[in-house]
Amino acid sequence: MAKAPSWAGVGALAYKAPEALWPAEAVMDGTMEDSEAVQRATALIEQRLAQEEENEKLRGDARQKLPMDLLVLEDEKHHGAQSAALQKVKGQERVRKTSLDLRREIIDVGGIQNLIELRKKRKQKKRDALAASHEPPPEPEEITGPVDEETFLKAAVEGKMKVIEKFLADGGSADTCDQFRRTALHRASLEGHMEILEKLLDNGATVDFQDRLDCTAMHWACRGGHLEVVKLLQSHGADTNVRDKLLSTPLHVAVRTGQVEIVEHFLSLGLEINARDREGDTALHDAVRLNRYKIIKLLLLHGADMMTKNLAGKTPTDLVQLWQADTRHALEHPEPGAEHNGLEGPNDSGRETPQPVPAQ
């Protein structure tokens, strides 16, 4: 059997020279339980599953944290809905993919498939038990004691209606907020808890209450991707053109976070499609920068201006010269039926992302 090239220091899963690697024949041997091959395979699988558990925890933690720093909003503008924790996960996944691909070239993965499946089932049972232990306790049938402000705000995230009702019934303000001026309305809008939102609004919650970054519930609903929340807030008079500290409208936020249905809804309302933020960027600038293919199509078909310059003097067409060939084609040929010209995103079309093209 030909020797594989020597690899060393490949991210978190460094590999020894081929002489130290166990051959495929050992995996398939009838005495696999007693072999060094099984021990190494088991260690590799344990490491892989442990990494997956860590990644899931990071993703969950990131989803629970509301960005309340101006730098985080700026990062959302330029890079989309991401966080440092999720970027770390992506980097680890790339390393792991490379390492596992190398391992597959050296051993017969099929020979340990049963072992992998067995380990996964055991790990899944542990994860299920852990998740059950971390679930918020169920609401009591009746809340007798007083509800403090912190519990009230937490209930808006967790969807605990009885806690919300008790706080309001005892005279608590629906506009109660934390140190970041985040109200229960902001929190419930991000999570999509419709019944709680209706209760808060019926009890006088200020629909356009702005937090420390001037974000309203409408901004948070766009981040959460909840179209039904957007419509509910609108029905209570929410301003769909309100600006945060970056002068971003809800349309800007929906574009940056990739919420296609919300973008389509806003455009159907006839909102100011060419509204500019603090850097002079329109929604189309953001969509091009972040390669939001479907959103680019929607904006163009609704009349977005391709020649609007931002404060750096760049139009969306200028920006796309640095990015994707398909996107540039969309800007230059915004005809109906553009869904056939490659505007669907990589996840929709199944095609590889085209390489950037040089400016002409």
Swiss-Prot record:
Mostly expressed in skeletal and cardiac muscles. Found in slow fibers. Also expressed in kidney, but to a lower extent (at protein level). Phosphorylation at Ser-99 by PKB/AKT2 in response to oxidative stress induces translocation to the nucleus and negatively regulates myoblast differentiation. Residues 126-147, 330-360 are annotated as: Disordered. Gene3D superfamilies: Ankyrin repeat-containing domain. GO terms for biological process: muscle contraction; muscle organ development; negative regulation of myoblast differentiation; negative regulation of transcription by RNA polymerase II; regulation of transcription by RNA polymerase II. The modification Phosphoserine is found at residue 99. The keyword Phosphoprotein applies. Residues 330-342 have a biased composition (Basic and acidic residues). The keyword Nucleus applies. Residues 5-120 are annotated as: May mediate interaction with PML, p53/TP53 and YBX1. ANK repeats lie at residues 147-176, 180-209, 213-242, 246-275, 279-308. One of its GO terms (cellular component) is I band. Its main location: cytoplasm. Keywords: ANK repeat, Cytoplasm, Nucleus, Phosphoprotein, Repeat. Changing residue 99 to A: Loss of interaction and phosphorylation by PKB/AKT2, loss of translocation to the nucleus and loss of function in myocyte differentiation. Pfam families: Ank_2. Interacts with ID3; both proteins cooperate in myoblast differentiation. Interacts with TTN/titin. Interacts (via ANK repeats) with TCAP; the interaction is direct. Interacts with TJP1 (via PDZ domains). Interacts with PML; the interaction is direct. Interacts with p53/TP53. Interacts with YBX1. Interacts with AKT2. Functions as a negative regulator of myocyte differentiation. May interact with both sarcoplasmic structural proteins and nuclear proteins to regulate gene expression during muscle development and in response to muscle stress. This is Ankyrin repeat domain-containing protein 2. It comes from Homo sapiens.
